[in-house]
Every structure is written in C-alpha cells, then in structure tokens.
Amino acid sequence: MEQTFIMIKPDGVQRGLVGEIIGRFEKKGFTLKGLKLLTVDQAFAEKHYADLSAKPFFNGLVEYIISGPVVAMVWEGKNVVTTGRKIIGATNPAESPPGTIRGDFAIDIGRNVIHGSDAVESAKKEIGLWFPEGVANWSSSLHPWIYE
C-alpha cells in the first residue's frame, strides 16, 4: 500500500487546525501510520527543503518552518500521494478551490498550512528523513469497507 508524508506547518498548528486536517484524511479512508509534534532546527528544515535551496523564497521558507511546532505524519492508502495532494489543494491557496485544506484555511502562499509529498519517490525520502525509526505496522479493521 502506498504511503505519503504530510506536515502541518506552524501556522496550521498555531491556528488549531490539526484535528480538522487529520479528520479529512481519516474520513477519506486513509490510515495514519506515524505522527509527531516537534519543532525542527534550521539544518533539518534545510535538509527537508533541499530541492528548493536555489529558489529566492528558500530562506523565508526555512525560517517559517522553524518558527514553531509542526505535525509530521505518514498516511497510507491506495493512491494516497495523488489523492492527498487533491485534499490539500494547490500550493498557492488562491488557486485552491473551496473544499480543499488550503482553499478553506489559507490565504497566502507563504502561510499555506500544510505540506504533502508530490510523488511516491519524494514521499519515501521524506518519510525516511522524518521517521528514521519507522512507522506503526497496523491495518484498519475498516479496510474491507473502503477497498475492493
């Protein structure tokens, strides 16, 4: 079964959106496999966003991510990377329709509440970085009611 990495950014944590966001993934039928509330340092944030290091917004992004606690999660399910991105919405909240997390809760691209892996390969890399100890090995009893 496919896995993805989802991070609720400091603005999402500060605004009390953690439960709402988790609920959206649970209601879709995805299984939570890992969950951490933590504050990361600059080196860790730079490693996570290394692929964006040449972008002009990189330093501001790193400062934003280290400004407060984040919630790091691993979700599992069929097509969870692609579907998770649809649940989240476009990177720019102005381009995210109502009903998506960013469409409902974000206004500015620099405070867009949530990060989600953009591909299976990046999900594996991000899960390895954020959860080096691994994730919970369990299956929901609801799987037969969700999957064919």
From Swiss-Prot:
Its cofactor is Mg(2+). The active site is at 115 (pros-phosphohistidine intermediate). It holds the Pfam family NDK. Its EC number is 2.7.4.6. InterPro entries: NDK-like_dom (IPR034907), NDK-like_dom_sf (IPR036850), Nucleoside_diP_kinase (IPR001564), Nucleoside_diP_kinase_AS (IPR023005). CDD domains: NDPk_I. ATP binds at residues 9, 57, 85, 91, 102, 112. GO terms for biological process: CTP biosynthetic process; GTP biosynthetic process; UTP biosynthetic process. GO terms for molecular function: ATP binding; metal ion binding; nucleoside diphosphate kinase activity. It catalyses: a 2'-deoxyribonucleoside 5'-diphosphate + ATP = a 2'-deoxyribonucleoside 5'-triphosphate + ADP; a ribonucleoside 5'-diphosphate + ATP = a ribonucleoside 5'-triphosphate + ADP. Keywords: ATP-binding, Kinase, Magnesium, Metal-binding, Nucleotide metabolism, Nucleotide-binding, Phosphoprotein, Transferase. Belongs to the NDK family. PANTHER family: NUCLEOSIDE DIPHOSPHATE KINASE. Major role in the synthesis of nucleoside triphosphates other than ATP. The ATP gamma phosphate is transferred to the NDP beta phosphate via a ping-pong mechanism, using a phosphorylated active-site intermediate. HAMAP family: NDP_kinase. This is Nucleoside diphosphate kinase. It comes from Helianthus annuus. The lineage of its organism: Eukaryota, Viridiplantae, Streptophyta, Embryophyta, Tracheophyta.
